[in-house]
Amino acid sequence: MSGKLKITQVRSLVGRNEKHRRIVRALGLKRMHMTVEHTNNPAIMGMVKKIPHLVTVEEV
């Protein structure tokens, strides 16, 4: 489970649930097609699993 994840926002937040918006912001994503790197840990994976329709995830 160690390693890094590249998380990219691929869908807009317009009209989305406030909880989903907060999760995207907590991941550090501010706009469409922005990519961030995070360590692969249960907290990050939990956030990603709640918004799979808004982001893509790649292992680095």
UniProtKB/Swiss-Prot annotation:
It comes from Desulforapulum autotrophicum (strain ATCC 43914 / DSM 3382 / VKM B-1955 / HRM2) (Desulfobacterium autotrophicum). One of its GO terms (biological process) is translation. The keyword Ribonucleoprotein applies. The gene is rpmD. This is Large ribosomal subunit protein uL30. Belongs to the universal ribosomal protein uL30 family. The keyword Lipid biosynthesis does not apply. GO terms for molecular function: structural constituent of ribosome. Part of the 50S ribosomal subunit. It holds the Pfam family Ribosomal_L30. Signal peptide: none annotated. Keywords: Ribonucleoprotein, Ribosomal protein. One of its GO terms (cellular component) is cytosolic large ribosomal subunit.
